[in-house]
Amino acid sequence: MRKFSLRDMKKVTLGKALFAFISSENMGLKKKSQRKEMKIHFTNLFGQSSKSVALMAQNDIMNVVRELGVNELGIYFYDHSNEPASELNSRMDGILAGVAFGDIVFVQSPSWNGIEWDRRLVDKLKLLQTKLVMFIHDVPPLMFESNYYLMPNYIDMYNQSDLVVVPSEQMYHRLVSEGLTVKKYVVQKLWDLTHSLDLYTPQFEKKLIFSGNPSRFPHIIDWKYETPLHVYTEPVEGVDYSKVHIEGWRTKQELLLELSKGGFGLVWGNSENPEDERDYYKENISYKLSTYLSAGLPVVVPDYLSNADYIREKGLGFVASSLEEANRLVQDCTEEEYAQMVRKAQYTSYLIRNGYFTKKLFVDTIMALGE
C-alpha cells in the first residue's frame, strides 16, 4: 500500500482550500447578483363596527390594491391607554415584520388609535428607511374643532412622508397653509366601492335618497320640501321621522340594489345653509357620493363639495346652491334628462365598481416616488 508523504498531504490541503475559496467566491457572486425585490405595503384597519365608514373605506382600498400584489399591514383599533411601552413596541414590530429596508409603505391615515400611536408607527417606518406615503383619509383636527390643538402633531407626522395622497386639491392647499412641506402629492378625487352585483337600471322618479345616520344632519330630519326624501338608516327611538320616509338600515349589497332602482342620491353637509358649512366638508370627499355613483344613481350635491366640478362636468346629476334649489331641480327634471344622466353615471359607476380611482392614484404615486 502506498504511503502518503508530507508533500501529498500538502497537495490535499491546498486543494481543499482552493475549492473552498472558489466556492465562497461563487456564492458571493450569486448573492451580489440577486437584488432584493422591493415590496409595497398598505396599512389596513380592523376592529371597528362593520357599519364604520372609516373601516369600510380602508378595507375597500385594500381590496383593490391587493390585486396589484400589495402586502397588507393589519392594524387593529383598540384601547391602548394602559398598554405598556414594551408591549406596544412588540405589537408594532409584529405589524411591520414583513417590511424590509427600502420598501414602499402606504399608511392609511388615521388609524383612529390616536396621534401618538400613529407617530410611533411612522417613526419605526422611518428607521427602516422606507419610502413613506401618507394616504390621508381624514384629518381629525379639521374634522372636530375640539381637536384642532393637535394640528401641529399631525403636520409633523405628515412631513415625515415622501408623498401625500390627499382627497382634493383644496385639502392639499389647506394642509400647506397649516405647515405641510411635502412637495409631492396625488389627488384621490373619488372613493372606490367595489362590487360585482347585477344591479337595476335606475328609473325616473322625483324622489331624493339619503344614506346614513341623519343625527348630524337636522335639516334631513326636518325635511320641508315637496320632493319626498327616503332615508336609509337604523331608526333611533325618540326621534321624529314623520317628515321623511325611513327605509331602515341595509347591508352594502342590499343598499346598492335598492339605490339602483331610481331617484336621486342626496349629498349635503351638516348645515342646511351652505354659508354655515364648515370648511372640512369642502376639502374632504364623500364616501356617500361614491355609494350612489357605484349604484349608477344620478346625484344632487352642494356647489361647495370638493368634487362638485366633476359631477357638473361629467353630467352625473345636479349641483345646487341650496336645498330649495335642489328640490326645484328635481321637480323640473324630465324623464329624458334623467335617462341621459343615468347613461353618463353608468361609466363612472364602472370605474368605481372596478377600483379604477384607487388603481390610478396607486400608479401615479409609484411613478412620482421615482421622479
Identify the function of each model-found stretch:
Residues 253, 257-295, 301-309:
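Nucleotide-sugar-dependent
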Residues 191-260:
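Conserved catalytic-core segment of nucleotide-activated headgroup transferases in glycan assembly
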Residues 162-176, 181-197:
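Donor nucleotide-sugar binding/catalytic pocket of nucleotide-sugar-dependent glycosyltransferases
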Residues 314-320:
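A short acidic/histidine/glycine-rich donor-binding loop in glycosyltransferase catalytic cores
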Residues 2-79:
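N-terminal subdomain of nucleotide-sugar transferases
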Residues 82-173:
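Extended catalytic core of nucleotide-activated donor transferases of GT-like folds
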Residues 321-328, 335-371:
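A charged, aromatic-enriched C-terminal amphipathic alpha-helix characteristic of glycosyltransferases
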